[in-house]
Each structure stands twice: as C-alpha cells, then as structure tokens.
Amino acid sequence: MTLSKYSKPTLNDPNLFRESGYIDGKWVKGTDEVFEVVDPASGEIIARVPEQPVSVVEEAIDVAYETFKTYKNTTPRERAKWLRNMYNLMLENLDDLATIITLENGKALGEAKGEIKYAASYFEWYAEEAPRLYGATIQPLNPHNRVFTIRQPVGVCGIICPWNFPSAMITRKAAAALAVGCTVVIKPDSQTPLSALAMAYLAEKAGFPKGSFNVILSHANTPKLGKTLCESPKVKKVTFTGSTNVGKILMKQSSSTLKKLSFELGGNAPFIVFEDADLDQALEQAMACKFRGLGQTCVCANRLYVHSSIIDKFAKLLAERVKKFVIGHGLDPKTTHGCVINSSAIEKVERHKQDAIDKGAKVVLEGGRLTELGPNFYAPVILSHVPSTAIVSKEETFGPLCPIFSFDTMEEVVGYANDTEFGLAAYVFSKNVNTLYTVSEALETGMVSCNTGVFSDCSIPFGGVKESGFGREGSLYGIEDYTVLKTITIGNLPNSI
C-alpha cells in the first residue's frame, strides 16, 4: 500500500475543500502568491492557498468591525439557532471534516473523528449558553440609587490557532465569541488551514450573517498578520493557542491598544502515579494521555513520575502495550497512530531522547524514525529512571517521547512537578482520596485530572496558570472572556414606599 494514494481528498461534499480565504461571505484570494499545504505523511501537496498580505487582513478586520454593529444586536435565541445549526452540520459532515484533518495534520482518522465530535460540542454548548448571559442587581450604600450589571460583547475578536487541533481550537474560541455577539477574524496555522476553510463554508450554511465569520490565510506573512490583529484598534480581543514565546510577542504587540487577551500556551504536564494506584488503569490512561496525537497535544503527559517501588514494572508493562501501536498513514483503517507534523518535531524528540540517555536514563523502548513509511513517521520512545537534570524535565517535547522519573514521597513529587514555569494540566493516580485532594491543591496548574488521562470537555473551564497563559475556554466561565461587564446606576430614586 503506497501512501501517495491518500494525498488527494475524496469528499462526500466537495464544497468543503476550499483554497481561498473567506471574508464578508465571499471566497477571497487577494493575491497571486500562494503557499502549499502538504500531507505530512506522504509529503505530497494537497492544496495551494493564497499568501494573503496585510491589506487583506485589514479588509477582514474592517468587515468584522462593521458587521459587529448589527450582529451584536441579534437576539441570543437567533445566535443559539445558528450555533445549533453549526453543531448539526459538523456532525452531518463528520467523515469529510475528519478526512481533511487527517490529510493536513497527519493524525489517525479515528482521532480526527473524535476531534470533530469534540469540536462540534462547543457549538452545542454555546448554543445553550447564549441565552444565559446573566447580570446582577446591587444595592449600593446610597438608598436612592439602584445598580445592575450587564454583559456586552467585547467586539471584533482575532483568533489565532495552532495546527495540532485544526478544528477544535477554532470552535473553542469562535463558538463562545459568536454566542455573545462578537464577530471573528480567524488565522489558522499555515500547515493546517483547510479545516478552518471548511468551517467557514459550514458557517455560511448555518445562517451566520456575512462578515461575522472570517478566515485569513498566510505562511510567510504570518508574523505581520498577527501583528496587525494585535495592533488594530478595531480588534478588541485576541485569543491564541500556541507556544509561550509567541504568546509573549502577541501580548507585547497588543499592549498598544490594551486589548482583552486569552492565551493557552505551552504545557509540561506531570503525570503522577503513586504506589497504591490501580496499575492497569494508570497504564491505559498513560497511553491515552501521552500518545494521543502521537504526543502532540498541549495537555499530553510530558513527564511521568512513577513511585520508585513500581517504576520498573510500570515501564515494562507500558512498553508492552505501546509496541502494539500500528503507525501508518492516518487514512489507513489499520492505523492507530499517524505521523508527526514535520521534521522539526522529530529533531526535538531525538534531542530530548539523547540528552536523557547521556545523563543516565534507561532505554525501555528504543523507538525511532520509520523512514520506510515516510519522512515524518516516528515510533514511540520510552525511557525510565530519567534524571531531573534532563532537558525534558524543563521543556515540552510535543512528540512521542515518554520519559519516566522516579519519586519516593508526596512532597518530593509535588516539588518536581511544580519545578517549571508552565502550569497547564497535571494528572494524579491514587486510590487514596486524601492523596488526590492534597496533591491536586498543591500542584501549580490550571487543571488537575485524577485517575483519568482524558478530561477535556466543553463543560469544563480549560486553561492554565504561570507561563501556560490565562483565560478559560468552555464551561459557564468561557463566555466571560468575550464580554465586558458594564455597571449601570440609576440614581435619585424616591424614598421607598
């Protein structure tokens, strides 16, 4: 079976496959320059999309700004209807949308289908939240005054998204923004723009007004486009998922207009297994947590801390299970795990692997390049007894390297886990509820998952602390990041009767 047979998409609805930006309800190129979208599994070109200049971004911002003047006055029930339509359309087109993800991202089709279901759930959630944007009534000290608060949409939102979840990272942000009455300008990653364009097509079918949902495209001009979104006074909010370094740049650029920001940045998640944990459960959850997307998710376990009394057994059993993975092209039905996104990802895995080995880590599963499959295929690596001085204890690998560290006490492992500038997610496995509660409170992360390695859901507030960012996506809190709280006072009322 050759990989090249998968390089051109065959979709039930060919209209989902687009190669132009989307502004004001129109498919816009805006330039003769293009960049190529490549299937990371085969290395073959699957699309050529426009390298849009700053002028096109400014056009999209202007359109979103003008549309906001009317969109903000649509009723919550109207917006809920469009959001619900979007949810239904995503599920109706699940196979096509998942195929697009697999071709541009490289993940296995089963994982891609899971992403579409997860992504769609945010439209369903915010369809239900849109009519429930509440304020409060307040009795101030002055007996003749009455105060109440309302939440209003912040305005045009710039949404800058990563490649690892090409659909879900858009919906987590755009669904909340659209629900409260904001308009959006979306900049997808240049490696995975096709999912965003498919979503724009569905947004039109769902009934969203022209100009409320816009998608801009660029590879070489990406820094300029991001800077334009951050510095434009017409853009009132920027939300970004990606690296901490880029987040810091965007934050600096946004300071000139004091924008509302929400960032979901780098992670370095600890996965802690105490000696009393259910070992089978911890192993199954470690596999799901560490190797989902072949380790290319922001909440993947980057550091596994296993109690010294069970570390060798845990490492051996984990390796036995990981050996059963079937690495291959994501569209091959036999494949359980696809490829990594590019050669830089492989280079980082190998750098972290060799550094840990040089410092004394034991190789449990060698892993390595699978060049016979393609340039970006890599078998998982498992190392045990990794020293705390290894680079991987400080840096997020974002790939199929599983380093296992040893610990003896609760205090010791919490110290290890918190010894990082990142604080997105953490995992704790134990049968003792006191251990779970005590460690969860002590961990310096925005989210702690106990006895499960998969926790993300539209109903939970997703976000981090420290240099993993700020703001929350999903849940009843996620909608607040796209609103401003206004206080209204009515004064000089007569005495109460």
Curated annotation (Swiss-Prot):
Pathway: Amino-acid degradation; 4-aminobutanoate degradation. The record marks N164 as: Transition state stabilizer. Optimum temperature is 25 degrees Celsius. It is an enzyme of class 1 (oxidoreductase). GO terms for molecular function: succinate-semialdehyde dehydrogenase (NAD+) activity; succinate-semialdehyde dehydrogenase (NADP+) activity; succinate-semialdehyde dehydrogenase [NAD(P)+] activity. InterPro entries: Ald_DH/histidinol_DH, Ald_DH_C, Ald_DH_CS_GLU, Ald_DH_N, Aldehyde_DH_dom, Aldehyde_DH_Superfamily, Succ_semiAld_DH. The active site is at E264, C298. GO terms for biological process: cellular response to oxidative stress; gamma-aminobutyrate shunt; gamma-aminobutyric acid catabolic process. It catalyses: succinate semialdehyde + NAD(+) + H2O = succinate + NADH + 2 H(+); succinate semialdehyde + NADP(+) + H2O = succinate + NADPH + 2 H(+). Keywords: Cytoplasm, NADP, Oxidoreductase. It comes from the Eukaryota. Inhibited by AMP, ADP anf ATP. CDD domains: ALDH_F5_SSADH_GabD (cd07103). Optimum pH is 8.4. The keyword Isomerase does not apply. Its EC number is 1.2.1.16. Belongs to the aldehyde dehydrogenase family. Catalyzes the oxidation of succinate semialdehyde to succinate. Can utilize both NAD(+) or NADP(+) as a coenzyme, but has a 2.5-fold lower activity with NADP(+) than with NAD(+). Functions in a gamma-aminobutyrate (GABA) degradation pathway that allows growth utilizing GABA as a nitrogen source. Functions in the GABA shunt, which allows to bypass 2 reactions in the TCA cycle by removing alpha-ketoglutarate from the cycle and feeding succinate and NADH back into the cycle. This is Succinate-semialdehyde dehydrogenase [NADP(+)].
